[in-house]
UniProtKB/Swiss-Prot annotation:
InterPro entries: Dystrophin-related_2 (IPR017433), EF-hand-dom_pair (IPR011992), EF-hand_dom_typ1 (IPR015153), EF-hand_dom_typ2 (IPR015154), KCMF1/Dystrophin (IPR050774), Spectrin/alpha-actinin (IPR018159), Spectrin_repeat (IPR002017), WW_dom (IPR001202). Residues 877-923 are annotated as: Disordered. Residues 358-383 form the WW domain. It is found in: Postsynaptic density; Cell projection, Dendrite; Perikaryon; Cell membrane. A zinc finger (ZZ-type) spans 605-661. It comes from the Eukaryota. It comes from Rattus norvegicus (Rat). Keywords: Cell membrane, Cell projection, Membrane, Metal-binding, Phosphoprotein, Repeat, Synapse, Zinc, Zinc-finger. Detected in trigeminal nerve Schwann cells. Detected in brain cortex and hippocampus. Detected in brain membrane fractions and highly enriched in the postsynaptic density (at protein level). This is Dystrophin-related protein 2.
Amino acid sequence: MQPLVMQGCPYTLPRCHEWHAADRFHHSSSLRNTCPQPQVRAAVTIPAPPWDGAGDPCLSPKLLNGSVGAVGPLEPSAMNLCWNEIKKKSHNLRARLEAFSDHSGKLQLPLQEIIDWLSQKDEELSAQLPLQGDVALVQQEKETHAAFMEEVKSKGPYIYSVLESAQAFLSQHPFEELEESHSESKDTSPRQRIQNLSRFVWKQATVASELWEKLTARCVDQHRHIEHTLEHLLEIQGAMEELSSTLTQAEGVRATWEPIGDLFIDSLPEHIQAIKLFKEEFSPVKDGVKLVNDLAHQLAISDVHLSMENSRALEQINVRWKQLQVSVAERLKQLQDAHRDFGPGSQHFLSTSVQVPWERAISPNKVPYYINHQAQTTCWDHPKMTELYQTLADLNNIKFSAYRTAMKLRRVQKALRLDLVTLTTALEIFNEHDLQASEHVMDVVEVIHCLTALYERLEEERGILVNVPLCVDMSLNWLLNVFDSGRSGKMRALSFKTGIACLCGTEVKEKLQYLFSQVANSGSQCDQRHLGALLHEAIQVPRQLGEVAAFGGSNVEPSVRSCFRFSTGKPVIEASQFLEWVNLEPQSMVWLAVLHRVTVAEQVKHQTKCSICRQCPIKGFRYRSLKQFNVDICQTCFLTGKASKGNKLHYPIMEYYTPTTSSENMRDFATTLKNKFRSKQYFSKHPQRGYLPVQSVLESDCSETPASSPMLPHADTHSRIEHFASRLAEMESQNCSFFNDSLSPDDSIDEDQYLLRHSSPITDREPAFGQQAPCSMATESKGELEKILAHLEDENRILQGELRRLKWQHEEAVEAPTLAEGSAEATPDHRNEELLAEARILRQHKSRLETRMQILEDHNKQLESQLQRLRELLLQPPTESDGNGSAGSSLASSPRQSEGSHPREKGQTTPDTEAADDVGSKSQDVSLCLEDIMEKLRHAFPSVRSSDVTANTLLAS
């Protein structure tokens, strides 16, 4: 149906500011008002007003200009003529007024009818809104509106005719604007009444015209709105039918899915691909659902709401689509999890690495943990790894940290079967798994894939049977303990490659070259930050064993500075310079070189007899004395500090991890003969170490060393070991530095300090970095002892205060349960449980306090033991000295390496590691100083056993 187009009113209603015969109407109205009935008086002659109209008679000028007294009585004929004219004019005026009133009355009634009709139709049009959100109802509304528009259109000619009549009337009878003075006056003249009628007609015509224009415009807008709504509803209805059909088809496919447990493992990749294709095939459904929802939203904005049936259908489509999405996502996740857990690259095959009652479980971040169903406990470590750590405790009797660490790592290496893996094989696996980027972060699944490929390649190359699940699980456990003790499930690729490279069965030089290449740039150069990252990763290996304190601690900045001394002032270091530094076996990396020597020495037999245990032949390391002839010691006796009565480890010793040659025997004989003519004082003045020492200091927080993984919420065993070892090393270095200058290793309580001071490899050609002349005891003993005394006094005060505080807390904890029990009897029954719970908490607190007291007591005993040894040292009388007057106390040196199979070039002689037999003679001034210090010690510690008594009393209570 074509929209109805109404034409506007073809006239413009006049505002009527003109009045063409104003004077005429003015005089006639005034005449009507003053002379409603004409009367003639002989005595008074009233001049008639002049008339402007044509043919109107005028009075004689003489009558106008003359006075009444001067004019004589009018003639009868003239009076009659004037009177007749007045009557005629009055009659015409009355006729005109009656005609005007009749004409305006005929216009007012139709205009009012039109106004009422238009108002009624406007209300009917408003009643048609809002539209219903249903196609049938909107179509019905469309037909109704079409009939409505036809009715309005048919009324148009009549309305136009009435408005044209009103226009014609107003053009004949214009009016002026209504003034306030006229509107307030009660008496209206005929002219004013005519203007009021004209004004009223004009108002009615204006209202009718505006209502007509408004109605026609609303009809057109309503027609467009209905058409637009019907179009959207038809589109929504068609889209919902199509979506419903598509969803029904998809739900049918979903119903055919088999349970995950019924699928074959080999078919999992096919099912995963099928689910992905299914998801892509039904991806257009998402766009269709979005389109339908958008159309419904647009209709709602237009105040058109879907019917109950359509709303329910749309809601069902949305619900079905969401359910289908969830089903597809869950199905895909289940298939992927099953493929990951049971597929070729999954952790499912690792479940065979444990035996009953153990079970291997996986945390949400894919980190494995182990459940003991018999003990109902869980732990991070593999049961075999726990057993391995327990066996490592047997090596704690080794006095030298580097050898103790190397021996432990050797056991770990053999348990993980990494001693059979070559670095070349490991590099191939790294390249296959795209691990070239050292900053790449690996998750547990990636680590498992790499380890699995590594051990499978080992089986192929060596032709040996390897328990791949056990080796993979154990290696993963060890890597997580070293580089991810917090079990975050992430580790850097550099960490992974460093761990594998350190324990693989390859020459140490190749390992170091490879590790340097991982942090070097394209020009084979490395800056301090990247070198620090490498050393940080490497130091994590001994840290996990609790041995990091002997290698400079976790802070690698001193080692970085030591290495960059070889860079000749450049900001980067080259590979050759790095290897030159590492060949000196720096303190932070000496354990790696010792591990290599331990590996080589395992299968070596020396055809000689141990001078202490009489073992023959000597297996492993062989230690030859360079002070006494024909004195050889096996590795067990030397590393554990055993010595016979006449063969204490007081003299320079040479270490061999390969069979000796005749040239080496001759060289050692010459060295021994030379040392026979050297005094003990010579060895005290020329100590040499078995490795390059690194000055460990507290660094600022701005170190660029990478942060390690976060710790677990509970106390980590290895971290606690590291913490205690670091603290012990720090205390010993501060408190007992002078003990190591005067006591033999057999009498020293800390073998790590012995290693740190006397095991640095230093060559004769590198004196600048290794040889540090010891300070004379005669010149610095007083200052050192005073510092130690002040430190011990502070420690003693702190411990005494802590013991007093713990004693007070302990007494409160003992009294609190008694008070709680007494009050429980007096209180109501409902408070018994609360009091008992409080008592249990207090007992637990008491246990914690007792444990802490025990720790403090042990620490106090250590300090008192050191104090007692200090007193004995100060009170010890001078012993018989040699020709030079030196004391008899001496220090044993750590082993020297043989040159047979060492990475150093053939022909270069490794220096002897020697130690002094005595500290030196004490002068009379030093004796006086020691006596003075002894007095201070007596005043500072009046009773050595006082703290023991206090602690025992607390523990007994």
